[in-house]
């Protein structure tokens, strides 16, 4: 997993379903190539294989079930995600929370499969517990700010700083990224200045009238180098 990184979560937005998911992913890929920055996209499971076949940038799954491949109707195993072409996995988003033992199992399976692992956490202490599982990154996201347009880097900078310091002190090999309410390039720049190594966001890019222009704006701070 390369840093700094911008991860775009498509969630289950209509704007990112079907061929629209490919359109947004290609816009992200175009920006990544033009600016020379790291961008990953996380489409819905239904679009995962389609997007992975359509772009060269990293494609992450939004989550996975703890079941192994087999007779588990409606479940999605880590192996299924790998076979679909994903290169990474997001775990424990506040909209898809998991128990700690589930996160541990999924992290181990995903890493064994060669997938990047990003574990979401709501606060510094939970981020520390997540970092102890040795993911590639933890994403601190106060749930009350998600989707509000109130960027964590502006409205709760102390949460970001404490997480960066806490995880960095105990698990320096685990990167800290952040998200929740990120809407602009200015928000991304502020997050990087707080010591994070990237940003996880969704609606700002997915629901934009022109995804390419919006992703370009959001990614420019990554191209500027260390703050």
Curated annotation (Swiss-Prot):
Presence of keyword Cytoplasm: yes
A GO CC term assigned to this protein in UniProt: cytosol
Enzyme class: isomerase
Pathway given in the UniProt record: Carbohydrate biosynthesis; gluconeogenesis; Carbohydrate degradation; glycolysis; D-glyceraldehyde 3-phosphate from glycerone phosphate: step 1/1
EC number(s) reported in the record: 5.3.1.1
PROSITE patterns with a match to the protein in the record: TIM_1, TIM_2
Compartments where found: Cytoplasm
GO molecular function list: triose-phosphate isomerase activity
CDD domains: TIM
Pfam families assigned: TIM
Catalytic activity: D-glyceraldehyde 3-phosphate = dihydroxyacetone phosphate
Binding site for substrate: 9-11, 146, 181, 202-203
Active site: 93, 141
Biological process annotations from GO: gluconeogenesis; glyceraldehyde-3-phosphate biosynthetic process; glycerol catabolic process; glycolytic process
InterPro entries linked to this entry: Aldolase_TIM, TIM_sf, Triosephosphate_isomerase, Triosephosphate_isomerase_arc, Triosephosphate_isomerase_AS
Keyword field: Cytoplasm, Gluconeogenesis, Glycolysis, Isomerase
Purpose: Involved in the gluconeogenesis. Catalyzes stereospecifically the conversion of dihydroxyacetone phosphate (DHAP) to D-glyceraldehyde-3-phosphate (G3P).
Family: Belongs to the triosephosphate isomerase family.
Quaternary structure note: Homotetramer; dimer of dimers.
The name this protein goes by in its record: Triosephosphate isomerase
Organism, as annotated: Pyrobaculum aerophilum (strain ATCC 51768 / DSM 7523 / JCM 9630 / CIP 104966 / NBRC 100827 / IM2)
Lineage of producing organism: Archaea, Thermoproteota, Thermoprotei, Thermoproteales, Thermoproteaceae
Name of the encoding gene: tpiA
């Amino acid at each position: 997993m390369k840093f700094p990184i911008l991860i775009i979560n498509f969630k289950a937005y209509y704007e990112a379903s079907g061929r629209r998911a490919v359109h947004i992913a290609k816009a992200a890929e175009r920006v990544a190539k033009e600016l020379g920055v790291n961008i990953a996209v996380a489409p819905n499971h239904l679009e995962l294989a389609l997007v992975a076949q359509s772009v060269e940038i990293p494609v992450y799954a939004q989550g996975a079930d703890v079941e192994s491949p087999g007779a588990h109707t409606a479940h999605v195993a880590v192996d299924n995600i790998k076979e679909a072409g994903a290169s990474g996995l997001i775990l424990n988003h506040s909209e898809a929370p998991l128990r700690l033992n589930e996160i541990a199992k999924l992290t181990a399976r995903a890493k064994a499969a060669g997938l990047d692992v990003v574990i979401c956490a709501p606060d510094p202490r939970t981020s520390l517990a997540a970092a102890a599982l040795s993911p590639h990154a933890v994403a601190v996201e106060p749930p009350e700010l998600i989707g509000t347009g109130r960027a964590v880097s502006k409205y709760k900078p102390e949460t970001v700083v404490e997480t960066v310091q806490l995880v960095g002190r105990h698990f320096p090999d685990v990167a800290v990224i952040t998200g929740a309410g990120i809407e602009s390039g200015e928000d991304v720049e502020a997050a990087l200045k707080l010591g994070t190594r990237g940003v996880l966001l969704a609606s700002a890019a997915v629901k934009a009238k022109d995804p390419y222009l919006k992703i370009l704006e959001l990614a420019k701070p990554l191209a500027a180098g260390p703050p």
